[in-house]
C-alpha cells in the first residue's frame, strides 16, 4: 500500500523532484493547510466565483433549467393489472407455514393490514387540476388515455370511486375494515299506489330515473317524523344505532357527483306527496341531493346502501336524462359545423351508462368532490416505451404546511450487502407484479388521496380560449357548441376506434381515492420495505439452508446448487401465491453465481457496479468539459453517478470533496485538466468491495495530539508528530501507520470517526490517501482503558498491558436478518421430513 503513495504524489503534481521519505514523515504533511491551499490553486479548485456563463448540460446530465421535454406516445398501451388481493389473515398463513412469528415480523405485517395515512393538513384542489396538461399538443389524447388508465385501476380494485360525500364503491374482494353498507342500510319501499316496489327493482344506476321524486319525498316525510324526538343536541352527541335518517328539509345545493350539472336550477326538498315532479334533470338532482343529504345528516354510525345494485350498472340511458348529460345533449342539437360533435354522438344509438358503479359500496369519511393531487402519463421505463405508467403528484405531503415527516427505514449499505450476499450461492430474482398495489389502505385515508377529472367538457373548456365557464350557463344549449373544434372532433373520431362507447363514460367527471397505497407518497416505500422484508424473514426461517432477501419489490433467492434453487423457487412461489402476492413468472431471472441486485454485481469475490453504470461513467468523463464552469445542479447529477461507484475506487468519496464543496456553496465548478485526469484514472480502474471476514484483532492503534502508538502482537511502537494535530487526524494517521507496518486487515481503535470509515471531513489530500491505505480494512472498537496502544502513544513503552483477544464479527447492517428464531413447536403434524441435499445448514458468512 505505501508504495502507491509516491504515485499519488505524482498524480497530484506534488513532487518537486525530491524523493519521498517514510510514511510516518510524509503522511502528516498532507494535513498541512498551506499545502492544501497550493494544491487548490494548482487544480483550480478554490475559484468558485466565475464570470463566464455556466454550462447547463454535460452529456445526458442537465440542470433544472433545461429539463428534457416529455414525449407523448398516442400508441401507449395501458398495462393490465391482475386482481391483486393480499390475504387478510396473512399472519395466520405465515404461522401455518413457519410456526410462531417473531415480534418484528408480526409488527411489520400488522403495519400493512391495513396501512393508514393521516396527514395533519390536506389541501384540496379543483377537479380541473385532476389531469395535468402535461402534453399541451395532445390534450385530448392524454385526457382519454389517463381516464382509461384510472378506469383500469378502479376495475382492478386499486381505487375507490366516490359515489357521494360519504360513500364509495369499488371492485374486487372486500376486507373486513371496509364496512359494507348493510347494518344501517336504507331499502326504500314505497306504498303500492305509486306503482313502485323498491329501489332494488330499478335497472339503471343507483336510483331509477323515472319514479324517484315521489318515492323520496314520502320517505323523507316518514324518516323526518320518525326522528323528531331525537333532534337537537342529544341527537348529535349520542348517535342512534337505528340506521334511520335524520334529514332536515333544507335546500341542498350539493349534487351527486359523476353527473354533469344542468341548468335546471335549485331543487327544494319540500315534503309533499305530489307525483307531478317528472322533469328528469330535476328528479335526478333531487335524488342525488337526497343521497348526499342523508349521508351528511345520518345519525347512525353507518351509511346507506341500495344493496340490490347490479355489479356494473350499465343499462341504456333513459330518454329523460339526456338533458343533464353534456355528451348526449349533442344528439338533439343542430350541428354547428362539419366538425360538430353531434356528428360523432349520432354515430351510435346506445352510448352506455353515464356512470358505472362498483361491486361493493362502503361507508367513507366525508370526502369532497375535489382532488388532492394531479396525474399524468409517462413511459413505463426507459426500456419500455410501448406501455404507459401513471405518475401521481401528491407532493403537497412533502412540502409546505401539509408536509409529513415520513418514517425512516434501514437501507442496507454496500458493505452489509456484500457481507450478506457475497457467497457461492446460485441466485434468482423474483418479479412482484405491481408491488405497491398489494398493500391495502384504510378507507379513512381516502379523503387525503384523491385523484380524478372534471369531465371532458370542462377540461376542454379550460384549455380553449373562446369559451366562458359560467356557472349559470354551463351545460346549456347556448354554450354547448363552444367546445366544438376541428382538433377536438378529429381527436375524438380517432379515439372512438379505440374506446368505442367508453368515450361517453370517460367524458363524465369522476373522483377516485386510493384503495391500495399509491406510489407518489413517501409512506409507500417504507410500507413496501416493511412488507417484503417481513415476508423474506419468514421464508428464511422456513428454509434455513437458503437465503431470501429483498429491497422494496426486488426479491432474490439463493441456494447452494441449481437443483436446490429450483425446488426452493417452486416452494416459495407457491407460498407467496397462497398469501395473495402476484408474481410475474416471465420476468423471473436466473443469475447463476453472480447476482445482479440494486445496481451491483455480487459474487463470491465481492461486489462491483453493474456494467451499464460503468459505461455511464465512461461516457460522463468523455463529455466532461475542462476549464468551463459547470452549473452546480449538473454537478449534483455528476456526483450522484460518481458517488455510487466511489467505494470501488482507491480514494473513495474524499476524491469528490471539491465537487461537494461547490454544490454546498451553490457555485459553478470548473474542472482543471489535472483534476479531471485524477478522477478519470480513479474511475477507469474499479476494485471490488470484498466481504469482511470474522477474526481476532491483534493490531491496535492509538494517538494523542502530539504522538502515536501501535501494538502489533507483543511488539510496541511509538512516534511523535512534528506539530500538534487535531485528535481525529492523529488517530487516523495512527490507523494508517498500523495498516502500513503490519499489513493487518483488522485493527482496533478507540476513535469513532476512524471506526465509521468516513474520511470526507479530514483535509482533502489526507482523506484521499487514508482511504487508499485503509481500503479493505475492518475496525474493532476497543475502549481507551483497555487499548494496548494507549501507553505507547503517551510515550510509555516499558509498561505492557495484556493483549486483548477482541473477536470481530462482520455486520449485515440493520436488516434484522438473523434474529434468533423462537423455539418452534411441531406445528405441522403430517410434515414430511427429508434429508437436505446440502447435509449442512448454510449460515451467513
Curated annotation (Swiss-Prot):
Its EC number is 2.7.7.7, 2.7.7.49, 3.1.26.4. InterPro entries: DNA/RNA_pol_sf, DNApol_viral_C, DNApol_viral_N, HBV_DPOL, Rev_trsase/Diguanyl_cyclase, RT_dom, Viral_Replic_Matur_Polypro. Residues 1-179 are annotated as: Terminal protein domain (TP). Residues 180-348 are annotated as: Spacer. One of its GO terms (molecular function) is DNA binding. Residues 349-692 are annotated as: Polymerase/reverse transcriptase domain (RT). Keywords: DNA replication, DNA-binding, DNA-directed DNA polymerase, Endonuclease, Host-virus interaction, Hydrolase, Inhibition of host innate immune response by virus, Inhibition of host RLR pathway by virus, Magnesium, Metal-binding, Multifunctional enzyme, Nuclease, Nucleotidyltransferase, RNA-directed DNA polymerase, Transferase, Viral immunoevasion. Residues 234-243 have a biased composition (Polar residues). Residues 226-252 are annotated as: Disordered. Activated by host HSP70 and HSP40 in vitro to be able to bind the epsilon loop of the pgRNA. Because deletion of the RNase H region renders the protein partly chaperone-independent, the chaperones may be needed indirectly to relieve occlusion of the RNA-binding site by this domain. Inhibited by several reverse-transcriptase inhibitors: Lamivudine, Adefovir and Entecavir. Residues 693-845 are annotated as: RnaseH domain (RH). The record marks 65 as: Priming of reverse-transcription by covalently linking the first nucleotide of the (-)DNA. Mg(2+) binds at residues 431, 553-554. It catalyses: DNA(n) + a 2'-deoxyribonucleoside 5'-triphosphate = DNA(n+1) + diphosphate; Endonucleolytic cleavage to 5'-phosphomonoester. The keyword Metal-binding applies. HAMAP family: HBV_DPOL. Multifunctional enzyme that converts the viral RNA genome into dsDNA in viral cytoplasmic capsids. This enzyme displays a DNA polymerase activity that can copy either DNA or RNA templates, and a ribonuclease H (RNase H) activity that cleaves the RNA strand of RNA-DNA heteroduplexes in a partially processive 3'- to 5'-endonucleasic mode. Neo-synthesized pregenomic RNA (pgRNA) are encapsidated together with the P protein, and reverse-transcribed inside the nucleocapsid. Belongs to the hepadnaviridae P protein family. Terminal protein domain (TP) is hepadnavirus-specific. Spacer domain is highly variable and separates the TP and RT domains. Polymerase/reverse-transcriptase domain (RT) and ribonuclease H domain (RH) are similar to retrovirus reverse transcriptase/RNase H. Hepadnaviral virions contain probably just one P protein molecule per particle. This is Protein P. It comes from Hepatitis B virus genotype A2 subtype adw2 (strain Rutter 1979) (HBV-A). The lineage of its organism: Viruses, Riboviria, Pararnavirae, Artverviricota, Revtraviricetes.
Amino acid at each position: 500500500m505505501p508504495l502507491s503513495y509516491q504515485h499519488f504524489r505524482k498524480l497530484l503534481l506534488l513532487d518537486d523532484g525530491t524523493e519521498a521519505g517514510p510514511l510516518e514523515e510524509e503522511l502528516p504533511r498532507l494535513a498541512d493547510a498551506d499545502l492544501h491551499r497550493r494544491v487548490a490553486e494548482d487544480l483550480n479548485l478554490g475559484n468558485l466565483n466565475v464570470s463566464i456563463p455556466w454550462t447547463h448540460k454535460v452529456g445526458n446530465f442537465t440542470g433544472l433549467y433545461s429539463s428534457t421535454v416529455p414525449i407523448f406516445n398516442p400508441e401507449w398501451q395501458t398495462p393490465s393489472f391482475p386482481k391483486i388481493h393480499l390475504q387478510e389473515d396473512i399472519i395466520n398463513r405465515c404461522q401455518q407455514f413457519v410456526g410462531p412469528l417473531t415480534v418484528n415480523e408480526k409488527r411489520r405485517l400488522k403495519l400493512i393490514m391495513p396501512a393508514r395515512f393521516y396527514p395533519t393538513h390536506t389541501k384540496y384542489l379543483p377537479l380541473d387540476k385532476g389531469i395535468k396538461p402535461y402534453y399541451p399538443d395532445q390534450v385530448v389524447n392524454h385526457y382519454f388515455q389517463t381516464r382509461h388508465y384510472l378506469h383500469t385501476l378502479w376495475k382492478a380494485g386499486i381505487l375507490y370511486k366516490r359515489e357521494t360525500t360519504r360513500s364509495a364503491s369499488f371492485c374486487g374482494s372486500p376486507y373486513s375494515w371496509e364496512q359494507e353498507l348493510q347494518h344501517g342500510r336504507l331499502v326504500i319501499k314505497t306504498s303500492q299506489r305509486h306503482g313502485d316496489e323498491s329501489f332494488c327493482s330499478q335497472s339503471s344506476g343507483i336510483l331509477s330515473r323515472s319514479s324517484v321524486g315521489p318515492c323520496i319525498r314520502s320517505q323523507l316525510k316518514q324518516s323526518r317524523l320518525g326522528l323528531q324526538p331525537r333532534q337537537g343536541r342529544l341527537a348529535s352527541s349520542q348517535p342512534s344505532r337505528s340506521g334511520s335518517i335524520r334529514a332536515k328539509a333544507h335546500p341542498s345545493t350539493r349534487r351527486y357527483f359523476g353527473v354533469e350539472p344542468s341548468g335546471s336550477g335549485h331543487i327544494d326538498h319540500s315534503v309533499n306527496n305530489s307525483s307531478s315532479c317528472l322533469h328528469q334533470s330535476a328528479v335526478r338532482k333531487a335524488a342525488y341531493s337526497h343521497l348526499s343529504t342523508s349521508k351528511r345528516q345520518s345519525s347512525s354510525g353507518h351509511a346507506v346502501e341500495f344493496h340490490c345494485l347490479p355489479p356494473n350498472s350499465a343499462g341504456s340511458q333513459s330518454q329523460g336524462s339526456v338533458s343533464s348529460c353534456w355528451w348526449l345533449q349533442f344528439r338533439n342539437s343542430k350541428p354547428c359545423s362539419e366538425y360538430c360533435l353531434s356528428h360523432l354522438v349520432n354515430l351510435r344509438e346506445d352510448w352506455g351508462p353515464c356512470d358505472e358503479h362498483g361491486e361493493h359500496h362502503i361507508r367513507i369519511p366525508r370526502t369532497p368532490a375535489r382532488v388532492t393531487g394531479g396525474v399524468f402519463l409517462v413511459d413505463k421505463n426507459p426500456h419500455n416505451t410501448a406501455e404507459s405508467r401513471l405518475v401521481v403528484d401528491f407532493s403537497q405531503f412533502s412540502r409546505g404546511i401539509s408536509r409529513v415527516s415520513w418514517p425512516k427505514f434501514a437501507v442496507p449499505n454496500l458493505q452489509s450487502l456484500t457481507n450478506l450476499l457475497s457467497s457461492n450461492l446460485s441466485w434468482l430474482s423474483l418479479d412482484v407484479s405491481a408491488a405497491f398495489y398489494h398493500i391495502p389502505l384504510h378507507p379513512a385515508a381516502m379523503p387525503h388521496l384523491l385523484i380524478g377529472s372534471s369531465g371532458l367538457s370542462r377540461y376542454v373548456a379550460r384549455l380553449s380560449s373562446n369559451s366562458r365557464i359560467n356557472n349559470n350557463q354551463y351545460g346549456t344549449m347556448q354554450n354547448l357548441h363552444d367546445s366544438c373544434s376541428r382538433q377536438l372532433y378529429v381527436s375524438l373520431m380517432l379515439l372512438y376506434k379505440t374506446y368505442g362507447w367508453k368515450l361517453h363514460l370517460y367524458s363524465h367527471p369522476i373522483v377516485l381515492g386510493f384503495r391500495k397505497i399509491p406510489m407518489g407518497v413517501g409512506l409507500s416505500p417504507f410500507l413496501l420495505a416493511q412488507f417484503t422484508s417481513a415476508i423474506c424473514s419468514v421464508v428464511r426461517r422456513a428454509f434455513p439452508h437458503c437465503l431470501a432477501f429483498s429491497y422494496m419489490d426486488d426479491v432474490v433467492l439463493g441456494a447452494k446448487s441449481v437443483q436446490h434453487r429450483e425446488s426452493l423457487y417452486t416452494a416459495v412461489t407457491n407460498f407467496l401465491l397462497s398469501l395473495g402476492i402476484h408474481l410475474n413468472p416471465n420476468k423471473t431471472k436466473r443469475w447463476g453465481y453472480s447476482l445482479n441486485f440494486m445496481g451491483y454485481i455480487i459474487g463470491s469475490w465481492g461486489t462491483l457496479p453493474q456494467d451499464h453504470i460503468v459505461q455511464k461513467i465512461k461516457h460522463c468523463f468523455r463529455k466532461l468539459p475542462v476549464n468551463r464552469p459547470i452549473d452546480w445542479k449538473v454537478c449534483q447529477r455528476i456526483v450522484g453517478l460518481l458517488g455510487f461507484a466511489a467505494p470501488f475506487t482507491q480514494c473513495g468519496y474524499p476524491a469528490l470533496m471539491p465537487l461537494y464543496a461547490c454544490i454546498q456553496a451553490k457555485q459553478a465548478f470548473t474542472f482543471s485538466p489535472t483534476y479531471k485526469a485524477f478522477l478519470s484514472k480513479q474511475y477507469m480502474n474499479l476494485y471490488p468491495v470484498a466481504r469482511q471476514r470474522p477474526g481476532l484483532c491483534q493490531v491496535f492503534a492509538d494517538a494523542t495530539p502530539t504522538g502515536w502508538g501501535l501494538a502489533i502482537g507483543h511488539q510496541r511502537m511509538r512516534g511523535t508528530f512534528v506539530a500538534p494535530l487535531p485528535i481525529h487526524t492523529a488517530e487516523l494517521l495512527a490507523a494508517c501507520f498500523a495498516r502500513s507496518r503490519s499489513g493487518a486487515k483488522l485493527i482496533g481503535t478507540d476513535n469513532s470517526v476512524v471506526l465509521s470509515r468516513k474520511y470526507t471531513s479530514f483535509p482533502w489530500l489526507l482523506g484521499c490517501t487514508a482511504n487508499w491505505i485503509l481500503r479493505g480494512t475492518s475496525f474493532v472498537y476497543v475502549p481507551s482503558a483497555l487499548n494496548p496502544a494507549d501507553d505507547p502513544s503517551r510515550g510509555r513503552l516499558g509498561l505492557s498491558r495484556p493483549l486483548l483477544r477482541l473477536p470481530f464479527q462482520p455486520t449485515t447492517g440493520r436488516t434484522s436478518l438473523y434474529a434468533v428464531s423462537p423455539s418452534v413447536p411441531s406445528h405441522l403434524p403430517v410434515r414430511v421430513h427429508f434429508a437436505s441435499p446440502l447435509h449442512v445448514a448454510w449460515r451467513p458468512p
